Structure formats: C-alpha cells, structure tokens
C-alpha cells in the first residue's frame, strides 16, 4: 500500500478541521468500518489508520472495486451524495456484447430494486476497444476457454443497489468485473488496490 500526498486543490470552503481521502477499494472489502454481522469481513479500517468519524461517501459492493471517497465532514458527504455527479465504471461482461445491448443500456433498462420494478435513467455506455489498464485482481475471474468477454464503460448519475450488475444482466450479459474509475472530476488514475491518498477536499467532484 502506498501513500501519496497531492498538491492542494482549490478549496470548497475554509474549514480545514476535516480530513478527506480517495482510496482504491480492493475486491472483497466492504465499504464500511463497522461490521453488520459477526461474520468476518474485510473492512476499510484495515487499509489505513483513518481518523475517527471517517465515513464513505456512497458505496461499492463487496465484489466491486475502485474509486471510493471518504471524509470526516458529514456536510460535504451530504452535498456530494445529493448532487447528480457522474460516476464512471469499467465493466467486464461475459460474452461479446452487441450494439443492441449497448443501445439498450444507454436508453435505460428495467431492473428490480427492493422487489419493485425500476426503469434506469438514460446513461452513457460504450464498448472499449481495448482492455483497460487496470491492476490485476487477486482472484481469477474466469477461465478464458469458456468464451470471450467484453469491456464497456458505463457512466451514471444515479446509484441504486448493484445497479450496473442488474443493468448488464437485463441486456443478457453478466458482469464479471466492476471497477469504478471516476467520480465527477476525481479519477482513480494509476492507484493500486488498497492505496489511500489524502485530499485537500472534494470540491472538484462538485463542479458542473
């Protein structure tokens, strides 16, 4: 795990009493500090000695990885979560995804949320010409002899529970790997799984 300090960015406000971080949440970790059950799970506190009252802004599920923002500032967390900020994901799906499926994702598909039907909002979706340069995942995803896979980019301004996995399943292509690479103007860049980078603030994510 490496710790990289970035140059200060333009400030969202003058409050310097809070601390902010961006991290690469590894596969297999929960986006929280306190377990919800007695079952042993990997938690964010194992990655870094975060200050008290640090909270994740949004979540990535256990099987997903990539960019996650953390802060001790509840107001900033609320502001970011309340805005329609783009979140971009690189998604590896099972099979050779079709143009028809890409178009359906762009237009919105019907998925299930808490037992109710939900129509996803229109989003940006495109097929990536080449496999993205991402850190290798520790656990093998699938034997390549089982057929082709495709990489796509999906950019949303909403975030329902396991939404992208449900969206790709709705168009006939199961998600094999899901990596969040951008939130607003904050990108994961060349971070590695488990890496933590302190930030001045997250005002860049609020632009636009």
Region annotations inferred by a language model:
Residues 2-208:
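RNA pseudouridine synthases
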């Amino acid at each position: 795990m490496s710790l990289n300090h970035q140059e200060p960015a333009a400030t969202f406000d003058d409050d310097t009493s809070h601390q902010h971080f961006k991290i690469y949440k590894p596969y297999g970790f929960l986006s929280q500090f306190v377990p919800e059950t007695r079952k042993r799970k990997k938690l964010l506190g194992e990655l870094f000695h975060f200050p008290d009252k640090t909270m994740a802004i949004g979540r990535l599920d256990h099987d997903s990885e990539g960019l996650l923002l953390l802060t001790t500032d509840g107001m900033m967390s609320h502001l970011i979560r309340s805005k329609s900020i783009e979140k971009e994901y690189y998604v590896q799906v099972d099979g050779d995804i079709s143009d028809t499926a890409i178009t359906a994702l762009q237009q919105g598909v019907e998925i299930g949320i808490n037992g109710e039907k939900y129509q996803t909002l229109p989003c940006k979706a495109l097929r990536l010409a080449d496999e993205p340069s991402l850190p290798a995942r520790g656990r093998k995803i699938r034997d390549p002899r089982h057929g082709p896979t495709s990489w796509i980019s999906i950019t949303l301004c909403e975030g329902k529970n396991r939404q992208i996995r449900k969206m790709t399943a709705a168009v006939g292509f199961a998600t094999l790997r899901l990596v969040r690479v951008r939130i607003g103007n904050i990108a994961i860049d060349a971070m590695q799984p488990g890496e933590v980078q302190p930030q001045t603030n997250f005002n860049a994510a609020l632009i636009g």
